[in-house]
Amino acid sequence: MQELKGIGASAGIAIAKAYRLEEPDLTVEKKNISDSEAEVSRFDEAIARSKEELEKIKEHALKELGQDKADIFSAHLLVLSDPELLNPVKEKISTDSVNAEFALKETSSMFVTMFESMDNEYMKERAADIRDVTKRVTGHLLGVEIPNPSMISEEVIIVAEDLTPSDTAQLNREFVKGFTTDIGGRTSHSAIMARSLEIPAVVGTKAATGTIQNGVTVIVDGINGDVIIDPSAETVKEYEEKHNAYLAQKAEWAKLVNEPTVSKDGHHVELAANIGTPDDVKGVLENGGEAVGLYRTEFLYMGRDQLPTEDEQFDAYKTVLERMEGKSVVVRTLDIGGDKELPYLQLPKEMNPFLGYRAIRLCLEEQEIFRTQLRALLRASTYGNLKIMFPMIATVNEFKEAKAILLEEKEKLVKAGQAVSDDIEVGMMVEIPSTAVIADQFAKEVDFFSIGTNDLIQYTMAADRMNERVSYLYQPYNPAILRLITLVIEAAHKEGKWVGMCGEMAGDEIAIPILLGLGLDEFSMSATSILPARTQISKLSKQEAESFKEKILSMSTTEEVVAFVKETFK
């Protein structure tokens, strides 16, 4: 019996035989060719066949996983139509008289290396897209079949170096009980897909493929990030009991689907969900979400080759508002730049894009893009309970300017006879430390705050959470972070305004009792975290949590805070 430690990417426990998803031999040799025109035609044919396959995979992903996951394959299809990739391959075939496989390998390797060297998560994901697409096209050129996980017909746990988006989208939930990989993290494509499919997964083990043989029994514990190879009968029994306990826990959570979120001493807080597309609303309602606390509208702009029209945006916003049936929907205006780029929007190359031209800064300069989105939102406002918030606000003047543009567009629509809701709350994200420090000034201008802890933490601690060498400094429970959060909540409440939180911290079991004690009004998280959080809050006393507020805020280290919370609220 052996044990590997990785990252629990999708909760649950699975026990089954290992199925190694072997990488095909796609060794490419350089060959000189005499008929470059015929070779270019061979390349075009491989591209066409790859597009056909991806269209089918995209259709399957849309049906099984929803629009945002299908959009991954829209991005792949864009790569297969991108002249910046295809033209250099064809030029290399013609100029160097080399075979298509070699020309593709050389060109794609150059792009992958370039993208992976960027300090930008979005561009790193594009490198993964190019690798995935290149593998598929190369397979067609070599006549090598690419493994198809949808053909698996017995209960297995997949073992792979990594799973591409194409692999994961083709997993058959009936037979694939879980998977484990050598590489990857919680935010990798495969991890996100696993959570959508509710398949237990452990990624980043570093040694799964080097240790696990085909057919051996494997346990995947996606809750704790453990992989047990060839377990004893006693260990199998132990994990079967853990699996049953997890299912019982899920059943307990399910009882609270239609219940409000109320603490042990009767205090109500709102549990909301973060979404990226209209299809995500289904998960919000199935998990008992009381609101949408963050609608990330940038997904409307990604995976396509041009800006979405006003009508396309209107349809998306209207759909979300209608499906939420009067429950609050907080829409964040376009947050592009930093780790999210648009291929059709020529953003300047910056030394540090996270501190550069992004989000509201871009929108205030590219006003036609901003105004189009605001018009679509205003037109949709009569179909539900819409709230609008601006991201990455750094100064009071930025907020005032953004709100003034919103009011200008509202006035134009009303004059044109368009119905617009009269009670749209307008708020802002708190992601920049300077904003938290003068939250009392912002509180006079806004209707609400939403604290984006992911960025607030990394800006406050000067630590990129994606950089493994400094990730130890990404500390949600650091007293400095907790004091900033307190400044925001106290400033808002003094002005009679409410405060939400839409970063990962909002659904964290260590953070929840702290945030309850600090007075947070709305906790917005992934939909699958809502019921566990509701269960936890129902067992907490707000009065007790408040009584420890000063003690926690007077602590000096993260470790001290965590130890106290674990001991006090165990």
Swiss-Prot record:
Names of required cofactors? Mg(2+)
Check the record and name the Gene3D superfamilies matching this protein. Answer: Phosphoenolpyruvate-binding domains, Phosphohistidine domain, PtsI, HPr-binding domain
Per UniProt, where does phosphoenolpyruvate bind?
Answer: 296, 332, 454-455, 465
Q: Which top EC class applies here?
A: transferase
Q: Name one GO cellular component term.
A: membrane raft
Q: Which PROSITE patterns match?
A: PEP_ENZYMES_2, PEP_ENZYMES_PHOS_SITE
Taxonomically, the superkingdom here is Bacteria
Please give the Pfam families that the UniProt record associates with this protein: PEP-utilisers_N, PEP-utilizers, PEP-utilizers_C
Q: Main localization of the protein?
A: cytoplasm
Query: Which residues are catalytic?
Result: 189, 502
User: Which compartments does it reside in?
Assistant: Cytoplasm; Membrane raft
What are the UniProt keywords, alphabetically?
Cytoplasm, Kinase, Magnesium, Membrane, Metal-binding, Phosphotransferase system, Sugar transport, Transferase, Transport
So where does Mg(2+) get bound?
A: 431, 455
Report the catalytic activity.
L-histidyl-[protein] + phosphoenolpyruvate = N(pros)-phospho-L-histidyl-[protein] + pyruvate
Q: Which GO terms describe its biological process?
A: N-acetylglucosamine transport; phosphoenolpyruvate-dependent sugar phosphotransferase system
| One Gene Ontology molecular-function label | phosphoenolpyruvate-protein phosphotransferase activity
Q: Which E.C. number(s) belong to this protein?
A: 2.7.3.9
Q: What else is known?
A: The reaction takes place in three steps, mediated by a phosphocarrier histidine residue located on the surface of the central domain. The two first partial reactions are catalyzed at an active site located on the N-terminal domain, and the third partial reaction is catalyzed at an active site located on the C-terminal domain. For catalytic turnover, the central domain swivels from the concave surface of the N-terminal domain to that of the C-terminal domain.
Q: What note about domains is in the entry?
A: The N-terminal domain contains the HPr binding site, the central domain the pyrophosphate/phosphate carrier histidine, and the C-terminal domain the pyruvate binding site.
Task: Summarize the subunit comment.
Answer: Homodimer. Interacts with FloT.
Q: Which family does it belong to?
A: Belongs to the PEP-utilizing enzyme family.
Q: What is the annotated role of this protein in its UniProt record?
A: General (non sugar-specific) component of the phosphoenolpyruvate-dependent sugar phosphotransferase system (sugar PTS). This major carbohydrate active-transport system catalyzes the phosphorylation of incoming sugar substrates concomitantly with their translocation across the cell membrane. Enzyme I transfers the phosphoryl group from phosphoenolpyruvate (PEP) to the phosphoryl carrier protein (HPr).
Q: What is this protein called?
A: Phosphoenolpyruvate-protein phosphotransferase
